[in-house]
Amino acid sequence: MGARASILSGGKLDEWEKIQLRPGGKKRYKMKHLIWASRELERFALDPGLLETSEGCQKIIRQLQPSLQTGSEELKSLFNTVAVLYYVHQRAGVTDTKEALDKLEEEQNKSQQKTQQAAADKGVSQNYPIVQNLQGQMVHQSLSPRTLNAWVKVIEEKAFSPEVIPMFSALSEGATPTDLNTMLNTVGGHQAAMQMLKDTINEEAAEWDRLHPVHAGPAPPGQMREPRGSDIAGTTSTLQEQIQWMTGNPPVPVGDIYKRWIILGLNKIVRMYSPVSILDIKQGPKEPFRDYVDRFFKVLRAEQASQDVKGWMTDTLLVQNANPDCKTILKALGTGATLEEMMTACQGVGGPSHKARVLAEAMSQANSAIMMQKSNFKGQRRVVKCFNCGKEGHIARNCRAPRKKGCWKCGREGHQMKDCTERQANFFRENLAFQQGEARKFPSEQTRANSPTSRELRVQRGDNPLSEAGAERRGTVPSLSFPQITLWQRPLVTIKIGGQIKEALLDTGADDTVLEDINLPGKWKPKMIGGIGGFIKVKQYDNILIEICGHKAIGTVLVGPTPVNIIGRNMLTQIGCTLNFPVSPIETVPVKLKPGMDGPKVKQWPLTEEKIKALTEICLEMEKEGKISKIGPENPYNTPVFAIKKKDSSKWRKLVDFKELNKRTQDFWEVQLGIPHPAGLKKKKSVTVLDVGDAYFSVPLDKDFKKYTAFTIPSVNNETPGIRYQYNVLPQGWKGSPAIFQCSMTKILEPFRMKNPDIVIYQYMDDLYVGSDLEIGQHRTKIEELREHLLRWGFTTPDKKHQKEPPFLWMGHELHPDKWTVQPIQLPNKDSWTVNDIQKLVGKLNWASQIYPGIKVRPLCKLLRGAKALTDIVPLTAEAELELAKNREILREPVHGVYYDPSKDLIAEIQKQGDGQWTYQIYQNPFKNLKTGKYAKVRSAHTNDVKQLTEAVQKIALESIVIWGKRSPKFKLPILKETWDTWWTDYWQATWIPEWEFVNTPPLVKLWYQLETEPIAGADTFYVDGASNRETKKGKAGYVTDKGKQKVVSLTETTNQKAELQAIYLALQDSGSEVNIVTDSQYALGIIQAQPDKSESEIVNQIIEQLIQKERVYLSWVPAHKGIGGNEQVDKLVSAGVRKILFLDGIDKAQEEHEKYHNNWRAMASDFNLPPIVAKEIVASCDKCQLKGEAMHGQVDCSPGIWQLDCTHLEGKVILVAVHVASEYIEAEVIPAETGQETAYFILKLAGRWPVKIIHTDNGSNFTSAAVKASCWWAGIQQEFGIPYNPQSQGVVESINKELKKIIGQVRDQAEHLKTAVQMAVFIHNFKRKGGIGGYSAGERIIDIISTDIQTRELQKQITKIQNFRVYYRDSRNPVWKGPAKLLWKGEGAVVIQDNSEIKIVPRRKAKIIRDYGKQMAVDDCVAGRQDED
């Protein structure tokens, strides 16, 4: 104590004792205050010796000041004492504590201003300064509401236009990742954009982690860890860590890095919202240059390019894409002109006044030489000739005509003029121009079908140029009687004018007809017209005759130096020429991916060199035909491609594995439910079978879906990058191709069908059956019409597959004029059969059974039972070999079917083959079958012949409706009418009874026994029951009679169901010829009441034998465990020592069913005899039953104590919302401001009403404030923060926000103030909206959840003995044994355990229960543990 008295000495101590504790107070500082201060400093781990100097006091002040806001009163007193002592050392002459504190604050403010001024002098932005306070610490200043408001306004007003990026860059200058996340959180409502941004951030973070791997071993002491990608994104790093990284030595600018990632994502978003390319920005003819510049730079900002590239775009594209008037002026300025000089020079260009000035200037320059006639008008003839347009007077470099594709010498594409081998320039080839008025050759129909639109010029004959266009729009086929010129190349035609042949361009955009280098008769007058690149002077000739494509027109012709001869509208209208934009012949079907899914991104696997070579050749050919097209790296999708050899050929076939794309593509409705059958065909005089070539490749694919079909042809040893393609047509192997093709083909055939109603066309995929009653010549004419019709739509019908003469091969059948059969079937002879061989064999026999009666396959199918590999060898049983030999014999002689006659009735005859197999024939005339078939399906393990016969009848009736459209044929059945009627009346549930007659075809079907419908008077009554233990498989079966007789037998390796059946068998054995049997087993009752005569179960077959021997049997059912006399007695009799009555017996089944159906707790408690507490716990632990929808990454924690908090905005005010995650119960209120103080007060109110364990919030400044942290600490609440833009984080409260606003909108007119409407909406949501689990309201649900939680905890406390056990367990995703966990309940099916604080239900088969041996477990060899294992 004495040592500390030396802090002040002499005059300083006297000055110390003069200072007042409070202004105007009587108490003054004493020596005891110094001694107390030194002791307090030791408590705070500070050196008391620091009090002896002013520098030491300053260090103490720096250390204590950050803790003042949350510190205790003792801490504040200590700070005040040290501050006064600091000024005593300084001899500042303070009079009281307040004066010392005011001086200290003033001094600190001056220091901070100096720091800020120094930073400003250095040119560093101070938007979000990380400044050094008086204590030398780096302190972060949070974003201001004004900055956030400016950012929100930018997004709302600009809607992700290019201006957003520079604005974001300016507002976020110097920001930390936490600041950036705060900015993004404020615009989180733009979910699509934020999802794109999140994807970009994740990709960049992963790339950062890849380029900056974690160093092995622990970090050196005192050194900060290196930031990971998630640290930079602010999700796994704290604000303090970010500040240390940004201000460290050397610094890691995590804020700038994260900002760069966000700007990359914003670029992608801007490109999506503003999809205009800089190349598309061109100045309009009359658009002011200033407006053009504004548009240009707006799009330039959105371009993802470096500054150098953007500079090049400004220098070149700005001038290049200007209109001709401005371009002339800009080129005159030179390359060094600034933007201001350009805008000044082009001011006013493009308006009417500018046009007038130019025209006047041009006219003033017209001299007498221009007005001279004929040859004087032309200048001196030049010898140079243009390779581009073929005209003399200029070279190709200066040509103003559009650039021609291909070689300038020969006109062919694929090489340049310097590489051309032709000697003579022949660009205007003869096949490109009309000759003698005929249309030039245009692209094939298939190419047009593959194009999105087919634009063409038509020269019409007739007075109504619109009639044909209208007819085409109605769906009829356009007539080809007049020339058509498609616009895939320039519409150049040959014209005749003044006896001279010229080539000219048909230009629907030109008013006048302008020709070059031609002498015309008659007088002319001078004229100036605006042309390409400026004004040209021309001679105007009137009433000139021109012949175009065989059509004559008279009108004005202008002659002058035009780059290309033009036929304008003044001539085109006279000959009826129209510009048509017909829709593509085949309308594309729009296709989308399944909601929430993206396209496939499957890597291409390696391929051999020969496969790569084959695929390259195939794709080159397909690309030429327009079926696929090359794509660049901008397409992120890929599907693997491979090649296989064609059957019996050395050629290769390309296959694309669309498995992943098929999973992601929307579902399609199958437009054709099955394949047509020849038995349903009507007999026709003439028949033709056609095949559509390249069927799928003739139908265009939706342009927006093409990108998802991308695939890559790799190179050997990665010599070059892979060649990327995407499909333009329907791909083979894609799930949508069949449905879209069938739909398209139906639409195409519809006009032909309507025009030719007497012709029958059966269409299945690319196979067409065409039948008619026309003579063969007329029929073939119609076939050619059909082929021509299909060709116009782009579908070819190759001659190779055009079948004109019988027999016709169609759909696997062979068609003759008056009969049909299946194509020849050869059954293989093998010494050994694999599973795959037998599968193919059964398939062939099933196919043959449609016309070959008597074929049986059941013995062969029995060989395939069990899980076997395709290559496993299967020995044939004697039964199977016999059936195979019989089937060979049946197939030896060919059998034919006949065609359907609509005027006659159908007859179906069924025969029993034995062993559960049936065969049938459908015919109209005896011995002339339309088709045959077989039935051998066993729908249940216990059946009888009558039941199988009725199932066969049902199958044939359905088949009749499908093939012939008839409800039912007349049946001939091998069963007595009395037997049939008995079964039909009692057991067959149907709305119709087929017409049938008895056929005495052995073996006949009969019922072997019949159960009574009423109890038998005078007969003994047997109460039967059975029980078994699931673990030991031991059980008992027995009965008790109404006369006191009883019997029990012990069973091994049994189940409850088998024991119940065994009890019935005992009763039948020990009873007389008449007996009443009562059981409580619905399973046993259902089997026996169906009156089976055969079964796969041995015990059921034994029961059937006993039933056949009885005269009369009555079987009844009573509910179990309801106190019914005889049933209760026999239940006790068989349960003794067998059943363990534990309520958790059914918990595993309940869990499995809940995982499938998500039923509520009441249903599980009822169905599985579970206590409500356990059933509710199963529901409570299922996150799918607590949330609407499912989180994209993981599941939301639905424990009873978790709440999510968020602020939402409405009518300019802030609504703070808290939602109980498990029940969706909400608390909400309008708060004055979005501050930490208001939020902390709300949290304390919430904690005072409900048990709050965890609150989950976003990273908003109010939630991260010290006030909220303090209130959470005081109330014992754990606070968790969400990951920005992760739907898992705040999904529940976000959806509740939307729901709350919706309800507020419904009641807003009933309340004057918003805060009233909010409370009304909360009441409605919590207590007036029911649904979800148990049909509860949210208020009822939260009370129920909390009550259940309390009951469960109290119930656990009562279990004492069982807690002496420990459980080791495994969960489904991890094979490692976990534990030990505490055992709470044990049942036969599952156990309830507690692992740490989490209660889990684990299936019994995944748990090991052992005694708690304490420390001995660690050293013993666990022998005793294995002995005690349950």
Curated annotation (Swiss-Prot):
SMART domains for the chain: ZnF_C2HC (SM00343)
Annotated region (Dimerization/Multimerization of capsid protein p24), positions in chain: 273-359
Location of the Integrase catalytic domain: 1196-1346
Ranges where the record places region Interaction with membrane phosphatidylinositol 4,5-bisphosphate and RNA: 14-33
Limits of the Peptidase A2 domain: 502-571
Positions where lipid (N-myristoyl glycine) attaches: 2
Binding site for Mg(2+) 1: 691, 766-767
Gene Ontology biological process terms from the UniProt entry: DNA integration; DNA recombination; establishment of integrated proviral latency; proteolysis; symbiont entry into host cell; symbiont-mediated activation of host apoptosis; symbiont-mediated suppression of host gene expression; viral genome integration into host DNA
Biased composition (Polar residues): 444-454
Ranges spanned by the short sequence motif Nuclear export signal, renumbered to the chain: 16-22
Region named Disordered: 438-475
Cofactor: binding details: Binds 2 magnesium ions for reverse transcriptase polymerase activity.
ZnF bounds (CCHC-type): 384-401, 405-422
InterPro entries the UniProt entry points to: Aspartic_peptidase_AS, DNA/RNA_pol_sf, Gag_p24_C, Integrase-like_N, Integrase_C_dom_sf_retrovir, Integrase_C_retrovir, Integrase_cat-core, Integrase_Zn-bd_dom_N
Keywords: Activation of host caspases by virus, AIDS, Aspartyl protease, Capsid protein, DNA integration, DNA recombination, DNA-binding, DNA-directed DNA polymerase, Endonuclease, Eukaryotic host gene expression shutoff by virus, Eukaryotic host translation shutoff by virus, Host cell membrane, Host cytoplasm, Host endosome, Host gene expression shutoff by virus, Host membrane, Host nucleus, Host-virus interaction, Hydrolase, Lipid-binding, Lipoprotein, Magnesium, Membrane, Metal-binding, Modulation of host cell apoptosis by virus, Multifunctional enzyme, Myristate, Nuclease, Nucleotidyltransferase, Phosphoprotein, Protease, Repeat, RNA-binding, RNA-directed DNA polymerase, Transferase, Viral genome integration, Viral nucleoprotein, Viral penetration into host nucleus, Viral release from host cell, Virion, Virion maturation, Virus entry into host cell, Zinc, Zinc-finger
Interaction with host CALM1 as annotated region, ranges: 8-43
Span list, region Interaction with Gp41: 7-31
Cofactor(s) the protein needs: Mg(2+)
Domain Reverse transcriptase: 625-815
Zn finger region (Integrase-type): 1145-1186
Further remark: HIV-1 lineages are divided in three main groups, M (for Major), O (for Outlier), and N (for New, or Non-M, Non-O). The vast majority of strains found worldwide belong to the group M. Group O seems to be endemic to and largely confined to Cameroon and neighboring countries in West Central Africa, where these viruses represent a small minority of HIV-1 strains. The group N is represented by a limited number of isolates from Cameroonian persons. The group M is further subdivided in 9 clades or subtypes (A to D, F to H, J and K). Resistance to inhibitors associated with mutations are observed both in viral protease and in reverse transcriptase. Most of the time, single mutations confer only a modest reduction in drug susceptibility. Combination of several mutations is usually required to develop a high-level drug resistance. These mutations are predominantly found in clade B viruses and not in other genotypes. They are listed in the clade B representative isolate HXB2 (AC P04585).
Protein's name in the database: Gag-Pol polyprotein
